[in-house]
C-alpha cells in the first residue's frame, strides 16, 4: 500500500511580482499543484492522500480556489483525501458531501485501511495541552498520525512537544506547518516528517518542494521525499570581490550559476569591490 503525505498547499495565497502576468501565472501553478498531485496518485495506483493542514491560505478562500480543490475531490473518487485543517484554514467548511473526502475535528478520529490506521486531530485552544494523553493506538496495527503545528520543547497552541508522543505506538507522524521537508525519529518505533509545501511561493521558500511517499509492505513502513514542484525557487550568492565592471560581474555569475529556464532565481552579489567601480 502506498500513501501520499502532503501539506501546506496554501491555495489562494498572495504571490507578488513586478510583472502582474508573472504573478498570475505563478498563482495558477500553485493552484494546479493539487490537481497534478491527484493525477500522480491516480496514475500510480495510490488511493490515500493525506493533507496535513493549510490547504487554503485563509478561512475565506476565493471561489476559484475552493472550486479547484473540491473539483479535484470529485474528479478522483477512487482516492480518499484525508483533510486535516491547519491554522490558516481553521474555519473552512464545505456544505457538499464527498464520500472520498475524510475530515477531522478537535477530537481524535481514525480511518482504517486493513491493518493501517490513520488517526488525526485538529489542534485548537481546547485541546492544545490535552491531546497527548487522549491518543490511544492499536500496537498491533501500523499507525499513522496526522497533526498540524510546530515542533517545540513546550506545550501550547499550535505547538507539538515530540517527547510527549514517545511510546504511543506511532509509526509515522505526518506533520504540516513547516514548508520544507524535514524528518526525524520519535522513538525506536516511529518517525515524523514535514512534507513541506508543493510549490515555493517566494524567496523564503527556496529549494526542492514536494510530498512524502509512504510505502507499506505487510508490517513495515518506509517513506521518502518526492520532489514535485513545477519550479524551484533558488537564492544564490556570487562573490564579485575585486571585479570592477559590469561585464566581468555578468561573466562571473554565468560561470558559477547553472540556470534552468523554468526556475526562479535571486542572485545576491557579495564581496568587496572598489568604491569607484
Predicted regions and their residues:
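N-terminal active-site segment of His-dependent metallophosphoesterases
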Residues: 1-67
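Structural beta-sheet core signal
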Residues: 5, 51, 83, 145, ...
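His/Asp/Glu-rich metal-coordinating catalytic cores
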Residues: 18, 22, 42, 48, ...
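Conserved residues at the C-terminal ends of beta-strands
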Residues: 52, 176, 270
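Domain-start "cap" segments at the beginnings of catalytic or binding domains
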Residues: 1-22, 209, 215-236
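Accessory, non-catalytic peripheral segments of nucleic-acid enzymes
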Residues: 218-277
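Acidic/glycine-enriched edge-of-secondary-structure segments
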Residues: 21-29, 116-122, 231-248
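Amphipathic, non-transmembrane alpha-helical secondary structure
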Residues: 31, 35-42, 67-70, 132-135, ...
